[in-house]
């Protein structure tokens, strides 16, 4: 090969590689374009974690996360494909492009931020005090003289200990099942537990008329987006912001959690 031809080959190779990288970048940013082109979005949701996601008596998925997924699809004007995931495979579903979004009680932490991106928060995930609607309970002071069931060593146990008055009779149980059983059977008047446990308990025991009473600790949920997909993330953030402003997200949280969304981080 002549020396004169080598610079031209080098330039051609450089241009080719640049085109490849630009194509890859365009592909990485095209998730929203793909959704709009096919008029359908694939969203991963939980089906084993009430009240955020579970299978109803009609065998259809329902819950806060499911309703949020449907809200996003409706705002985009596209059909929706719901894909059930577990805690273990929800992030890999984003990484392998099996889902455009993951709406599955995702908390944000540094390790997850290395591999996926997050939208603004869309709902709270919390530990709280629950009791029948007929129980007068508006402040921690109202726990005085009441029996309160809690799972030993759980986050709600630690948070309850911080606020419970000395006269509250706190009864600790070894696991969530025992705590719930004690409350349902009337051994305790009040229960301190996580939103998911409470949601499942309320769904199974509607006759108790249980409702949210006091917040112990709040940990918001975020929607997962593939790493670097800023276009889709920005669009979903627009939808979340509008839904928060209109009260739609508060309505979803009241429906499934018994409380409004409250202050959520952007």
Describe these PLM feature segments.
Residues 66-75, 141, 146-147, 152-155, ...:
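Extended ligand-binding regions for polar small-molecule ligands
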Residues 70, 74, 79-142, 209-210, ...:
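Acidic, polar ligand-binding/catalytic clefts
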